[in-house]
UniProtKB/Swiss-Prot annotation:
The lineage of its organism: Bacteria, Bacillati, Actinomycetota, Actinomycetes, Mycobacteriales. InterPro entries: Ribosomal_bS16, Ribosomal_bS16_CS, Ribosomal_bS16_dom_sf. Residues 136-146 have a biased composition (Acidic residues). GO terms for cellular component: cytoplasm; small ribosomal subunit. Belongs to the bacterial ribosomal protein bS16 family. It comes from the Bacteria. It holds the Pfam family Ribosomal_S16. The keyword Transcription does not apply. Residues 113-155 are annotated as: Disordered. GO terms for molecular function: structural constituent of ribosome. This is Small ribosomal subunit protein bS16. GO terms for biological process: translation. Keywords: Ribonucleoprotein, Ribosomal protein. PROSITE patterns: RIBOSOMAL_S16 (PS00732).
Length: 155
């Protein structure tokens, strides 16, 4: 059975997303796959290319033929060079930079506005002490001087 590594199209109009799959060469583009080994999103910046390198190496070793678009992707990831034993097996895949967290952006904007942040970005409300505790504290100091004056009178 002739096996090909090819792309299956997914996604909306003008926003293609592809699965990289291993399938019989005689099946249609969206036909039944033997195995899905990766995905490719060309519209993202930089393009998302995820290929399970171990499975791609296996299928290439047993004779699966990649189509031209898949061959280009395998060269970008370095899997084709690794399979052929050529230099440059690390590939030329670009990785997206991680986004800064929203808290960091908020603190940076706050620092620009009026200076460095004072602790947390949002201050919590102070909880009031229960009214009974306040009343007990207010009565206690008033009773102590009266007790002292009673002790002084008895002496």
């Amino acid at each position: 059975m002739a096996v090909k590594i090819k792309l299956t199209r997914l996604g909306k109009i003008r926003n293609p997303q592809y699965r990289i799959q291993v399938a019989d060469a005689r099946t249609r583009r969206e036909g039944r796959a033997i195995e899905v080994i990766g995905r490719y999103h060309p519209k993202e910046e930089p393009s998302l290319i995820e290929i399970d390198s171990e499975r791609a190496q296996y299928w290439l070793s047993v004779g699966a033929q990649p189509t031209d678009p898949v061959l280009a992707l395998l060269k970008i990831t370095g899997d084709w060079q690794k399979f052929k034993g050529l230099p440059g097996a690390e590939g030329t895949l670009k990785v997206k930079e991680p986004k800064p967290s929203k808290l960091d952006l908020f603190n940076a904007a706050l620092a620009e506005a009026d200076g460095a942040p004072t602790g947390e970005a949002i201050q919590q409300k102070k909880k009031k002490a229960p009214k009974k505790a306040e009343a007990a504290e207010a009565e206690a100091p008033a009773e102590e001087p009266a007790a002292e004056s009673a002790d002084a009178a008895s002496e």
